[in-house]
Every structure is written in C-alpha cells, then in structure tokens.
C-alpha cells in the first residue's frame, strides 16, 4: 500500500515581517492546486534521478533536490528543515552510488551553516525562476556556489570542534592478544 501524503491546501508564501508591520514576500510556493502534481514529479526525480551530469554528481543532485523541494513548499510548516534533511539523505545516497560506499548518513550536515546565513539562503532561492521565459543559469550557479560555501563553512566548524575535542583527549595504545588498538582517554 502506497503511503498517503497530506500537502497544504492553501497558498504558501515565504517572507518576513518588517518593523512597520508590512510583509516582504521573498517567494511563493507552488499554487495549492499544483502541489500534488509537483510533488509526484519531485518524488520521481528524487527516486530515479536522471541521466544528466547533475544526477551523476552527489553535490549537484542533492543541491537540486533541496532547491526543488523548497520552491514547491508542499507543507504549511517545516519545509526548510525537510529540504535540508532531504539534501543530506540524497547526498549520502549519491555518495554511496557514485563511490560504492555504504554510509548510513552524510558525515557533513550543512543545516547549521545555512541557518547562520539564512538571509543569503533565502535570497538565493528567491532569485531562481522556474519558467520557460527566464534563463536562470546564473542564479542556479549562485545557488550551487552558496551551498558549496556552506559545505566549506561547515567543514571549518567541524574542524574547530574536533580540535577542541582533540585537545581534551589523548590517544593511548591498548595491547590485545593479536593486535594493538588505540582508544581515546580523557585527560
């Protein structure tokens, strides 16, 4: 039995309330009447990918999945969190596929960096148009560059955290019957 999904039935906008009380709309999600169709297409793309270069590259494939989900905006709440989770899952799936690994989850989660850079994140999404009349190559490239910057920033954050952890632990050799093991021991 196929699971059933309940998508929003009202229009969705992403925006911010200004100090004077007016709302600055960044972008609108898909029209409520189109959400089921768009999500059906999205799920097919997610599951099957494609034959283009984008779908042979873990970074590009996961970034596109992230973006498409946000632009459809299928739920009344939690779309950003869900998009970032889908990004991580797709990235892990693609790493496993392309590099024949068996990761359970991506070792790198960019949510923290995205939340710190939320204004730029929203602007990058807002700048991308999905219509035949507009060539969004420049904006799509800006999206990819932004996500790449978030990966770099998150790697930097992770390295700083590891250095702090490393300074409070020492590595100690543990003799065993047939081999030597190393373990972390708190200083």
What is the meaning of each model-derived region?
Residues 1-187:
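FIC/Doc superfamily catalytic core
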């Amino acid at each position: 039995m196929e699971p059933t999904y309940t998508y929003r039935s009202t229009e969705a906008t992403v925006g911010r309330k200004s100090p004077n009380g007016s709302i600055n709309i960044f972008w609108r999600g898909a029209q409520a009447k189109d959400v089921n169709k768009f999500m059906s297409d999205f799920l097919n793309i997610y599951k099957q990918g494609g034959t283009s270069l984008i779908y042979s590259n873990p970074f590009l494939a996961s970034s596109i999945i992230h973006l498409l989900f946000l632009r459809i905006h299928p739920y009344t709440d939690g779309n950003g969190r869900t998009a970032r989770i889908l990004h991580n899952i797709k990235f892990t799936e693609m790493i496993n596929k392309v590099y024949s690994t068996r990761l359970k989850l991506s070792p790198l989660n960019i949510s923290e960096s995205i939340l710190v850079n939320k204004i730029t994140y929203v602007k990058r999404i807002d700048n991308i148009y999905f219509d035949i009349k507009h060539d969004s190559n420049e904006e799509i490239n800006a999206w990819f560059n932004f996500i790449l910057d978030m990966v770099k920033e998150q790697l930097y954050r992770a390295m700083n955290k590891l250095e702090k952890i490393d300074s409070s632990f020492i590595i100690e050799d543990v003799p065993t019957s047939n081999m030597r093991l190393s373990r972390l021991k708190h200083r």
